């Protein structure tokens, strides 16, 4: 559920988009989560204005408009403009969307739907269409939170109840903010991959694979007053210097930026920057089904063999936050007893390796997606940092389009450099995907963990920080002590925009692979 959302508790092969959207803001940036492009006045709004939004479509879109067929969670940033979910996510809460309210117990959830909401073709959103949407999206292997829904009861046309097969209401609630909870018109399902019927603020106008996705305003949308754009053009911009150039030349009006481009973008006089803190983090996942990482003592040693602060400074220009544990300090999952314990101590790591029966060190292969400066630079630094501790790491680059099959299905590599996306208030969500039997990554990498699973299962019953916090603090401490993952950097969400063209209050989304289009507009003239 991450991203607030869903179950994608792992974020499927989202193709890692080279961190192209989130990594930037340090403490100075985090002072404000929004940036005022200009005061919103009716006289300055161009109701036909089209926002040109830069995105790497080649690496972050699944080439289908059917959420049930998506294999890349980064498609969410486009899908969320086309489809409303039942709920929406903030960093610490879930909020109404197509459901105006809900009541829940650990094993059931009842949603009250928004009266009068329709799809773009005029069909109403009802309990029947919600059930059909869930049944359709549930067929995806990536939407595993939906497998918790045992049965669905249509109480009346605007009320629907989910009965769950486990006490995991918190997890399912978050799933309802994400791809899992997106609402599709069952009458349009046969053509949804190419001609979707929208339940969101925009409809599809045209699509050129790898080039552009053009959307226009959905004039039947229930909350159309919140959206002042005539449309949105998602246009292809590859990560790297092209992002800076696209902003500078006006080829795009808005885009997420990479860490290495922050200084150049900030120097542009007509560009504004908006930031939002996020739980997104860069992480090394290890394959624990075989040597060397089937030994928890080897994994534990590696926690002291990486210089998180050094990576933050060298790769992220000091703008991220070193991840000494899986949860940032501003969340209920942060464990004060762990704190910043796992600093770079290569001599200690080497001694731990020797004590585990490896006096001459261990060798392993780290897989990274090709074509990403951020991942490439991070991997090279990791290679140098790990060597004094006795970890001999080789780097293998794989095309982003092949990562999913090569690494997770075919078992290539001993570890992979990837990214976990925010799950908003559902702190347990990523751990569910990584370490429980239901999680895709946990199954494919052999990382299921019998010690962590009971803590995760208990936490999934509720989104309350008082429930999840103590459990995930304990789980995080265990994860670090046994090296179940190697968190590296927390990455705030950052978007840049053309101040001459974009008006309203620009708010960066709560994490990568998202877009926030409400309240902004294109200026007249």
Can you name each region flagged by the protein language model?
Residues 54-106, 197-198:
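N-terminal lobe/hinge region of extracytoplasmic solute-binding protein
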Residues 354-422, 465:
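Ligand/substrate-recognition segments at binding pockets and active sites
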Residues 72, 92, 176-226, 231-233:
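Gly/Pro-rich hinge or "lid" segments in bacterial periplasmic/extracellular proteins
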Residues 321-355, 372-375:
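Structural transition elements
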Residues 52, 126-132, 157-163, 200-201, ...:
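Alpha-helical secondary-structure segments
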Residues 208, 306-333, 374-383, 408-525:
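Detector for C-terminal structural segments
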Residues 220-265, 392:
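Ligand-site clamp/hinge motif
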Residues 46, 103, 108-110, 144-186, ...:
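Surface-exposed binding/hinge segments that line
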């Amino acid at each position: 559920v991450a991203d607030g959302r869903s179950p994608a508790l792992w974020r499927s092969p989202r193709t890692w988009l080279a961190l192209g959207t989130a990594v930037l803001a340090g403490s100075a940036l985090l002072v404000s989560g929004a940036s005022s492009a200009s005061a919103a006045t009716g006289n300055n709004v161009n109701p036909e204005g089209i926002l040109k939004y830069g995105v790497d479509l080649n690496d972050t879109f699944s080439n289908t408009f059917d959420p049930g067929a998506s294999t890349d969670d980064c498609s969410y940033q486009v899908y969320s403009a086309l489809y409303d979910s039942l709920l929406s996510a903030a960093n610490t809460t879930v909020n109404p969307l197509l459901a105006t309210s809900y009541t829940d117990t650990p094993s059931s959830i009842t949603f009250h739907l928004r009266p009068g909401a329709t799809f773009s073709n005029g069909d109403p959103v009802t309990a029947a269409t919600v059930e059909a949407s869930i049944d359709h999206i549930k067929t995806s292997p990536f939407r595993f939170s939906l497998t918790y829904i045992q049965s669905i009861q249509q109480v009346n046309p605007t009320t629907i109840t989910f009965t769950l097969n486990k006490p995991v209401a918190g997890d399912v609630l978050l799933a309802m903010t994400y791809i899992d909870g997106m609402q599709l018109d069952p009458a349009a399902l046969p053509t949804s991959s190419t001609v979707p019927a929208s339940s969101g603020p925009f409809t599809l106008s045209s699509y050129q694979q790898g080039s552009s996705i053009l959307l226009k305003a959905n004039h039947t949308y229930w909350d159309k007053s919140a959206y002042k754009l005539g449309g949105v053009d998602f246009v292809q911009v590859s990560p790297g210097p092209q992002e800076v150039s696209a902003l500078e030349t006006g080829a795009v009006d808005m885009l997420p930026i990479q860490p290495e481009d922050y200084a150049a973008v900030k120097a542009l006089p007509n560009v504004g920057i908006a930031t939002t803190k996020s739980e997104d983090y860069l992480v090394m996942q290890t394959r624990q089904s075989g040597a060397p990482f089937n030994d928890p003592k080897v994994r534990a040693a590696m926690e002291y063999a990486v210089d998180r602060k050094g990576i933050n400074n060298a790769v992220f220009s000091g703008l991220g936050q070193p991840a000494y544990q899986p949860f940032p300090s501003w969340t209920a999952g942060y464990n004060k007893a762990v704190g910043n314990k796992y600093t770079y101590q290569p001599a200690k790591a080497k001694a731990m390796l020797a004590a585990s029966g490896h006096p001459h060190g261990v060798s392993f292969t780290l897989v990274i997606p090709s074509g990403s400066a951020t991942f490439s630079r991070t991997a090279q630094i990791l290679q140098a940092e790990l060597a004094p501790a006795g970890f001999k790491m080789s780097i293998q680059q794989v095309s982003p389009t092949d990562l999913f099959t090569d690494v997770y299905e075919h078992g290539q590599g001993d570890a992979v450099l990837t990214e976990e996306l925010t799950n908003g208030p559902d702190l347990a969500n990523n751990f569910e995907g990584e370490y429980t039997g239901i999680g895709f990554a946990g199954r494919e990498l052999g990382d299921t963990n019998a010690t962590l699973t009971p803590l995760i299962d208990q936490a999934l019953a509720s989104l309350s920080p008082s429930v999840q916090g103590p459990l995930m603090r304990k789980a995080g401490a265990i994860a670090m002590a046994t090296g179940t993952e190697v968190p590296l950097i927390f990455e705030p969400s950052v978007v840049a925009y053309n101040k001459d063209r974009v008006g309203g209050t620009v708010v960066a989304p709560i994490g990568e692979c998202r877009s926030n289009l409400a309240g902004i507009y294109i200026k007249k003239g």
